[in-house]
């Protein structure tokens, strides 16, 4: 009976760990939950809520911004950040490239190298005539602690504590192989933690729009 209860407990732990999805974070806050809860968390970070525009305002990464909490089925799936003030073509190019460099040099992110705009690029012409879109996409790395918790929970469904403590080469090889397999399983079953930004043109002026997305909560067309 004790053994049965132990197995049930380990399976429950495994399911619970797996249910804790590794989602995109904004300022350390998971992009998830209800809109009202997210607004309160952002207010605690120093942002001010404007009930007229239904947006928050404040400073983010050295710039004055406006933030919108976007939901699907009452769950937050996106944090939308817009520069509060526009700027000219030269300044927006510098701002865009600076953001690219910041993401590239941030150990929490991965993405294609050199998504910057060249110095001789005519942004206004390309956007107006060729409808070119300037954007850069990066991905937050998976949470190592959550990966480890998932792997350990899965191992406990297959091995006893005594087996995991076995230091024999044969057992260690088996455990190492399973750790690798469970690690890949975690990666395959967790969606990308996407953070991207783009240049928005507004009658000759420009601003950066940035998006922190939780793909788990996005609409997948099942309501069609």
Annotate each language-model stretch with its function.
Residues 4-17:
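Sec-dependent N-terminal signal peptides
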Residues 9, 58, 125-128:
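Short acidic-hydrophobic surface loop/beta-edge motif
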Residues 20-49, 85-224:
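Non-cytosolic coordination micro-motifs
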Residues 42-82:
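N-terminal, post-signal-peptide region of Sec/Tat-exported proteins
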């Amino acid at each position: 009976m004790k053994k049965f209860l132990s197995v049930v407990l380990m399976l429950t732990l495994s399911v619970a760990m797996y249910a804790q999805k590794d989602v995109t974070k904004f300022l350390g806050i998971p992009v998830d939950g209800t809109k009202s809860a997210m607004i309160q968390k952002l207010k605690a970070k120093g942002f001010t809520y404007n009930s007229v525009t239904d947006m928050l305002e404040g400073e983010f990464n050295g710039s004055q911004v406006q933030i919108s909490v976007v939901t699907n089925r009452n769950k937050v799936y996106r944090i939308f950040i817009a520069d509060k003030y526009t700027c000219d073509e030269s300044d927006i190019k510098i701002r865009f490239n600076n953001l690219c460099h910041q993401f590239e040099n941030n150990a929490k992110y991965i993405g294609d190298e050199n998504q910057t705009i060249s110095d001789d690029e005519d942004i206004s012409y390309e956007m107006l005539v060729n409808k070119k879109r300037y954007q850069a996409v990066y991905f937050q790395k998976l949470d190592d602690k959550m990966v480890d918790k998932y792997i350990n929970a899965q191992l406990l469904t297959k091995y006893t504590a005594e087996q995991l403590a076995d230091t024999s080469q044969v057992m260690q090889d088996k455990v190492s192989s399973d750790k690798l397999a469970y690690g890949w399983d975690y990666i395959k079953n967790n969606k990308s933690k996407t953070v991207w930004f783009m240049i928005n043109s507004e009658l000759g002026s420009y601003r950066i729009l940035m998006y922190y997305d939780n793909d788990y909560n996005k609409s997948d067309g099942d309501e069609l």
